[in-house]
């Protein structure tokens, strides 16, 4: 299945139906009063976040979306039926952005969130509404109002507890494949991963969602190598797991390349908690590994972990789980657009 994380949509809510001007017509009733019904309301366009979706692929050939218009009113005080709402399901983590102003309309970052993006037009009034003591037979009615039309950009930012970052071929995909049920493609060449992958990892009594972010390269913050499409997914991660290929000639340079790109893209990303791991340690002698580990640890002034290609992942997974529990226990003030 393909992965689409951005799509432009043209939304048109339904127009309101027109009101009706009609009069009561019955045998032996010469001057029947007005009985024109109101027009029906136009359908709305509503977005709902669905935890069962993980891509915007279903919008690929559906860029113009229109809700039904309300029906016109009729005689005998019959109101037109309302237009049916259009319900659009999107993955959790989808943002709906106004294409013209570039402002975020809503951020659907929790399952089951519902938000009306385009409102249907009001139905027109039938002539019954204009009857008065001075106007017993009004012929006046109103037309329905047009529904809202909006051009929006849907952006999907993958939601995960942990984001695996690193240069291409650092072993991110294999790590995720080994510790989860993800079917990530693995190969011994750069850019095996061309889209984010999510995996669910069971750690003791906890579940951890881990995202394999495609390899980041120099100038990714400028969009090189689809950098913007990859970097935005890191914004949603609570913890970063930074994998570095221990066989790299300069592990400090390999670390700095990724760190700098994150900072240039969004300085908040480098404030996230980060666990640094030298990967593929079974490919070098112990003395070489220790030298590189100490060199990187001294540069970062923090602990650096080591991992073999087929080594035990449980210590790292338990560390991630513990840090997530601490992070989740902290009280965080989150802006909720659904609260007044």
Curated annotation (Swiss-Prot):
Query: Mind telling me which GO cellular component terms the entry cites?
Result: cytoplasm
Recorded hits in Pfam families, A to Z, give: GTP1_OBG, MMR_HSR1
User: In what residue span(s) does the Obg domain sit?
Assistant: 1-159
Protein residues bound to GTP: 166-173, 191-195, 212-215, 279-282, 310-312
- The residues that the entry says bind Mg(2+) are 173, 193
Where does the OBG-type G domain start and stop, copy by copy?
A: 160-329
Kindly list the biological process annotations in GO that this record carries: ribosome biogenesis
Question: What is its subcellular localisation?
Answer: Cytoplasm
Top-level taxon of the source organism = Bacteria
Alphabetically ordered keywords of this record: Cytoplasm, GTP-binding, Hydrolase, Magnesium, Metal-binding, Nucleotide-binding
Q: Name one GO molecular function term.
A: GTP binding
Listed cofactors: Mg(2+)
- The Enzyme Commission number assigned here is 3.6.5.-
* Thylakoid among keywords: no
Q: What this chain does, per the record?
A: An essential GTPase which binds GTP, GDP and possibly (p)ppGpp with moderate affinity, with high nucleotide exchange rates and a fairly low GTP hydrolysis rate. Plays a role in control of the cell cycle, stress response, ribosome biogenesis and in those bacteria that undergo differentiation, in morphogenesis control.
- Which HAMAP family does this one have? GTPase_Obg (MF_01454)
Q: How does it assemble?
A: Monomer.
Q: Which family does it belong to?
A: Belongs to the TRAFAC class OBG-HflX-like GTPase superfamily. OBG GTPase family.
* Name of this protein: GTPase Obg
- Organismal lineage: Bacteria, Pseudomonadati, Pseudomonadota, Alphaproteobacteria, Rickettsiales
């Amino acid at each position: 299945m393909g992965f689409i994380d951005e799509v432009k949509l043209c939304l048109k809510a339904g127009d309101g139906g027109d009101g009706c001007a009609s009069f009561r017509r019955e045998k032996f009733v010469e001057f029947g009063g007005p009985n024109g019904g109101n027009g029906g309301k136009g359908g709305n366009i509503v977005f709902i976040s669905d935890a069962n979706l993980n891509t915007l692929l279903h919008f690929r050939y559906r860029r113009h979306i229109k809700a039904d218009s309300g029906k016109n009113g009729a005689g005998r005080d019959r109101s037109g039926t309302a237009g049916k709402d259009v319900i659009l399901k999107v993955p959790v983590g989808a943002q709906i952005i106004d294409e013209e102003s570039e402002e975020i309309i809503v951020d659907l970052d929790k399952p089951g969130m519902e938000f009306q993006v385009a409102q249907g037009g009001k139905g027109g009034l039938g002539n019954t509404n204009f009857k008065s003591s001075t106007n017993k037979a009004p012929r006046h009615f109103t037309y329905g109002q047009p529904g809202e039309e909006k051009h929006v950009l849907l952006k999907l930012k993958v939601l995960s507890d942990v984001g695996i970052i690193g240069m291409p071929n650092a072993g991110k995909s294999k790590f995720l494949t080994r510790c989860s049920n993800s079917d990530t493609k693995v190969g011994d060449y750069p850019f095996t991963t061309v889209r984010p992958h999510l995996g669910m990892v069971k750690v003791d009594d906890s579940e951890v969602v881990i995202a394999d972010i495609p390899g980041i390269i120099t100038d990714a913050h400028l969009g090189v190598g689809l950098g913007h499409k990859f970097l935005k997914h890191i914004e949603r991660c609570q913890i970063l797991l930074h994998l570095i290929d221990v066989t790299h000639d300069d592990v400090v340079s390999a670390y700095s390349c990724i760190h700098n790109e994150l900072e240039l893209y969004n300085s908040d990303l480098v404030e996230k908690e980060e666990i640094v791991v030298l990967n593929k340690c079974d490919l070098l002698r112990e003395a070489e590994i220790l030298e590189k580990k100490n060199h990187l640890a001294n540069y970062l002034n923090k602990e650096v972990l080591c991992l073999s290609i087929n080594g035990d992942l449980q210590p790292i997974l338990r560390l991630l789980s513990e840090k997530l529990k601490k992070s989740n226990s902290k009280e965080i003030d989150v802006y909720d657009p659904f609260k007044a």
